[in-house]
Amino acid sequence: MSEQVRHVLTLQCPEGIGIVHAVTGFLVRHQRTIVELKQYDDMSAGRLFLRVDFAGDSAPDLLDALRSEFSEVAAKFDMDWQLRERGQKTKVLIMVSKFEHCLQDLLFRMHSGDLPIEVVGVASNHPDHRSLVEWYGIGFHHIPISKDTKPRAEAALLELIDQTGAELVVLARYMQVLSDHLASELTGKTINIHHSFLPSFKGAKPYHQAWERGVKTVGATAHYVNSELDEGPIIAQQVVEVDHTYGPQDLVAAGRDSECKALSNAVRWHCEGRVFLYGNRTVVLR
């Protein structure tokens, strides 16, 4: 028996009759077995979102052959699509400032095999976490940033992304506002964790804002970056119940776990091809 290999096909396109039939028919013709199929038909937008995890016998140049032949199906239905091997690790560059809990969580999950990622570097505007990062055998890049040096620092970040081949950038409590230019360059391939349940309490010190309002839940939001501060399409959110006895620092401590969980979920779903961007929204086929 030949070795079995698995692939994941993701697509979105205008809704219409026969799309799913065309996709499954393609898989049947190539003797592929569907392991998981998830779809969402957004009736209001008139758009279909589809993710198929399928398996079959290995063959030389199989992925290229599948891509070449599926392109004909895709063209017929005006599909925006991607086909890749399942389990292929996504190259990730992490950016961080002073707070290290999200960084530690991502590095541990990578090391334990919980996340399908390869961290190709960590960049920070502070030198604090060099020893932690290098313990994992990962390159640490200290890129100081100030108002005067921001254009030069952001150019260095873009160069680092290019040099490392990073496919995804993760802002793991990176406490610098990206310029419109950098945010535009990274649109759709950068995930930020905001320590608030957006759209509430944007900007700095959201836990202090939450305490002033007497909230009964605090949370965290992982979202794609765009040119608007904390306004990018939301991927994942987590909440923690609190009460009137929690002070601002208690809320900060309570929120850290939710930040780690929301960010790791967002990274996982992105790397598994479960997140679809459409306008300022996402569809997540979990």
Curated annotation (Swiss-Prot):
Active site, per annotation: D230
Domain of life: Bacteria
Keyword line: Hydrolase, One-carbon metabolism, Purine biosynthesis
Annotated metabolic or biological route of this protein: Purine metabolism; IMP biosynthesis via de novo pathway; formate from 10-formyl-5,6,7,8-tetrahydrofolate: step 1/1
Known EC number: 3.5.1.10
Alphabetized InterPro entries for the sequence: ACT-like_dom_sf, ACT_dom, Formyl-FH4-Hydrolase_C, Formyl_transf_N, Formyl_transf_N_sf, PurU, PurU_ACT
First and last residue of the signal peptide: none
Gene3D superfamilies from the UniProt entry: 3.30.70.260, Formyl transferase, N-terminal domain (3.40.50.170)
Catalytically driven reaction(s): (6R)-10-formyltetrahydrofolate + H2O = (6S)-5,6,7,8-tetrahydrofolate + formate + H(+)
Domain ACT: 8-88
Enzyme class: hydrolase
UniProt keyword Hydrolase present: yes
One of the GO BP terms on file: one-carbon metabolic process
GO MF, one annotated term: formyltetrahydrofolate deformylase activity
Role played: Catalyzes the hydrolysis of 10-formyltetrahydrofolate (formyl-FH4) to formate and tetrahydrofolate (FH4).
Family, as annotated: Belongs to the PurU family.
The protein, known as: Formyltetrahydrofolate deformylase
Organism for this UniProt entry: Corynebacterium sp. (strain P-1)
